[in-house]
Structure formats: structure tokens, C-alpha cells
Regions:
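Flexible glycine-/small-residue-rich
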Residues: 47-49, 98, 105, 125, ...
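A short glycine-enriched loop-to-beta-strand structural element that forms part of the catalytic core
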Residues: 46, 87-104
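Cytosolic nucleotide-binding catalytic cores of signal-transduction proteins
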Residues: 23, 42-45, 69, 73, ...
Length: 237
């Protein structure tokens, strides 16, 4: 974007940024993300606060959001090149990490910002810098949570500046195409493995039902899971 902006008038750049950030913000809101701040043409987004759908669903929402952002930019290419005189196609890169961070009001005694801080944020920022144009790059922490929903390229190791250790990361290829039979199999496997499902198991089960249910019964099942998370599941004979 920096190289492109040098070839375009400042007023047109301002108009483009307003257009672009509006488009990306709408997608963020659609998938339940919290916009922390705009940094030039970049957006910092986090999940898990002020509301969370659980680790698995939050991570999945974030990757779904990233994919839709990429798809939206691709669809807007003809309009962008015509409306804003861009000499080349615009591509965005996205870095995603999962980890603990501090969220709250930080700043001086005269001015506070609601923001997230911590090493997990820094790693996500570095992954964005390491990503290729048009790539969604996720850390291993994120991949572990969402690998049932997406396909990834082979593992690669990066050494992000400012991070004291190498980071294993993966490029998101696309969303897995799961048929109804495989979804039922995954849900059944969760149920029969242990009647005392963990929170992560419940998150995974809810995510599967919510996304892939093809009739109203799926919605009812999902609602039932939300209302009775601690109820044991019996295996009828």
C-alpha cells in the first residue's frame, strides 16, 4: 500500500482509506470481532472481550473473518482500480495469533484507550509482517483450535523481530468442505469418547452444529447445548 500511495494524490488516498476501512469494519462486526484501533491502512482486531463464544468459536470466527476480508478485496478489485486509479491489484495480508493478553483502559491520567496489550498481540503483528500479499498466516496456537474447519499449508518457522523464540506458523488454504455425514461423525465421536465433555469439546460441538446444521433441528440442538453445558450425555442402548 505504501508504494501505491506514493503514486496517488493525498485526497484520493484519504477517500480510499475511508472506503476500505468501512468495508473491513463491516466484516469485523459481522464475525463478532472488536476493533482495537486503526493504524494507517492496518486494523488491529481482537476476540474474547467484551464477549466470547469460547476459544474454538472465537478463533474460528477470526479466521472466517480474515478469509471473507480477502474475498471481499478480490471482489472489489475492478471498482478499486476504476474509482481510485490504483495501478495494480490491491492485496492484503493478515496475521492471527491466539494467547493471553491484558484488555482494559490504558493510558495517561488525562486520556485512556480501551485496548489489548501483551506478547500474543506482538506475535500477531509480526506474523502479519511475515505474511505474503494475499495471505492469512496463523500461529500454531490458532491452528490447533481451528484445524477441524480449515486446510493449511505445510508448517514453516519464522523468526519475528522482537519475539525471543521461533514461531511455527501456517498459511490458511481454504475452509474445509465437510459433508453432513462427516459432521455427524465428528459430533458422535465427541459424545461417545467421554460423557463428561470438556469446555473445549462443547465449544467444538457447538461450532459444528451452528455452522453446518441444515434444518431447524440443528438450531434447537445448539441452543440445548448452550443451556445445559454440564449435563452428562448418555449412550442409549
Amino acid at each position: 500500500f505504501t508504494s501505491i500511495s506514493e503514486q496517488i494524490e493525498a485526497e484520493e488516498i484519504s477517500e480510499f482509506l475511508s472506503f476500505y476501512l468501512t468495508e473491513m469494519s463491516a466484516i469485523t462486526e459481522k464475525f463478532g470481532g472488536t476493533i482495537d484501533k486503526f493504524i494507517g491502512d492496518a486494523i488491529m482486531i481482537f476476540y474474547g472481550d467484551p464477549q466470547s463464544d469460547g476459544d474454538v468459536q472465537d478463533a474460528k470466527n477470526c479466521v472466517d473473518m480474515a478469509i471473507e476480508m480477502q474475498n471481499r478485496i478480490d471482489a472489489l478489485q475492478p471498482y478499486i482500480r476504476k474509482q481510485f486509479s490504483f495501478p495494480t491489484n490491491l492485496k492484503i495480508r493478515i496475521g492471527i495469533n491466539t494467547g493471553f493478553c491484558n484488555v482494559g483502559n490504558f493510558g495517561s491520567t488525562s486520556r485512556l484507550d480501551y485496548t489489548a496489550i501483551g506478547r500474543a498481540i506482538n506475535v500477531a503483528s509480526r506474523l502479519e509482517s511475515e505474511a505474503e500479499s494475499g495471505e492469512v498466516l496463523v500461529s500454531e496456537n490458532t491452528k490447533i483450535l481451528v484445524e477441524d474447519f480449515f486446510d493449511f499449508s505445510s508448517e514453516r518457522v519464522v523468526h519475528p523481530k522482537g519475539v525471543p523464540h521461533p514461531v511455527n506458523c501456517y498459511s490458511v488454504s481454504h475452509e474445509k468442505s465437510l459433508n453432513r455425514e462427516s459432521i455427524i461423525g465428528e459430533c458422535f465421536k465427541l459424545v461417545i469418547n467421554d460423557s463428561n465433555l470438556t469446555d473445549n469439546d462443547l465449544d467444538t460441538l457447538k461450532a459444528l452444529v451452528a455452522k453446518y446444521a441444515e434444518d431447524p433441528n440443528g438450531v434447537i440442538q445448539n441452543e440445548s447445548i448452550k443451556q445445559t453445558p454440564s449435563s452428562p450425555v448418555s449412550n442409549p442402548h
